[in-house]
Regions:
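Flexible loop/turn connectors
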Residues: 230-291
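Alpha-helical recognition/docking segments in bacterial nutrient-uptake
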Residues: 72-165
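Periplasmic-binding protein-like
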Residues: 117-123, 175-181, 214-224, 239-243
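Hydrophobic alpha-helical segments within soluble ligand-binding/sensing domains
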Residues: 152-178, 257-280
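N-terminal helix-turn-helix DNA-binding module of bacterial transcription factors
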Residues: 1-62
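Short beta-strand segments enriched in small/hydrophobic residues
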Residues: 22, 59-76, 174-180
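A short, well-structured beta->alpha microelement
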Residues: 98-111, 194-214
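An alpha-beta-alpha
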Residues: 165-200, 280-291
Length: 291
């Protein structure tokens, strides 16, 4: 059986201390190490096929390189569920590129927290669910598409009301906004704050939604929801707010407004990384302008 290469083997071959190898392999920038030494250690580590264990990394950096991802899927909101999953995939892809693992945290009344988590990204949780999460997790929590309004937490959310205002250019002044309910009550209220009550159509049953949109001009939030309803309304009487990068395409005859999902994902991760490094920003409210 081939002997496993250790940090001591790399240090011996490179002619440096074990601590120096550890600093270099864990990208420690607070230690003064010459570029020549850094390159030499990395080359030898590569030649020996040395990979530090997760436990060793944790001891060296004080981190476990594990990020929790918390959201709740609702069987009554299939289009919104797809948006959540697509946005989560965007985050996971970027976090993995940074050598960070992601653990899904199912939000339930029997929430069990993995103590190896360094930080959490929570997406569209109700006030009750977020309170349960934050009361049990004492790590940085970044809330996305939620209005928490608590200086302990950062909140990042899409400025959907701006897109609703833009829709007047295409649909005129009298149109209904069709959307599935969001989990976060305050964010849903923020989205619909400037819409007359009779023009808000929150989907409950499909048949009821179809009956409400017939003969009306509508702005639909979510591409999947738009595709489900498209058979019951002409393309000229509808516009769509896209909430994902990975949605199925709509025909060119349908007017589509785009949220800047990539910017939201990048900002979420940047703020999380700063929080993990204890670089806390003064600004805790980040509204993402659309494309």
């Amino acid at each position: 059986m081939e002997k496993k290469v250790t940090v001591r083997d790399v240090a011996r071959e490179a002619g440096v201390s074990v601590a120096t190898v550890s600093y270099i392999m864990n990208n420690r920038t607070d230690m003064k190490i010459s570029e020549e030494t850094r390159k030499k250690v990395l080359q030898i580590a590569n030649l020996l096929n040395y990979r530090p264990s997760q436990a060793a990394k944790s001891l060296a950096t004080g981190r476990n390189s594990m990020i929790g991802l918390a959201y709740r899927l609702n069987p009554n909101t299939p289009s919104r569920n797809l948006d959540l999953i697509n946005f989560s995939n965007l985050l996971i892809e970027r976090l993995n590129r940074l050598k960070l693992d992601v653990l899904f945290l199912p939000v339930s009344d029997t929430l069990v927290i993995n103590r190896n988590i360094d930080g959490i990204i929570a997406i569209d949780l109700s006030h009750k669910d977020f309170a349960m999460l934050s009361n049990n997790c004492f790590v940085p929590i970044i809330s996305v598409d939620m209005l928490i309004n608590d200086s302990l937490f950062y909140q990042i959310y899409s400025d959907i009301p701006v897109l609703i205002e833009r829709a007047h250019e295409h649909l005129g002044n009298d149109f209904a906004v069709v959307l599935e309910p969001y989990e976060n009550e305050a964010y849903l209220e923020y989205i619909t704050q400037n819409i007359p009550g009779e023009n808000i159509i929150l989907t409950s049953s499909f048949a009821e939604t179809v009956s409400k949109i017939k003969g009306r001009k509508v702005l639909i939030i979510g591409t999947c929801l738009a595709l489900m309803l498209r058979s019951y309304i002409s393309d000229s009487d509808m516009a769509v707010i896209s909430c994902s990068e990975y949605e199925p395409p709509l025909p060119e005859s349908v007017y589509v407004y785009q949220n800047d999902i990539a910017k939201k994902a990048n900002l979420t991760i940047n703020i999380l990384l700063n929080a993990l490094d204890r670089k806390f920003e003064v600004k805790h409210d980040h509204k993402i302008a659309p494309l």
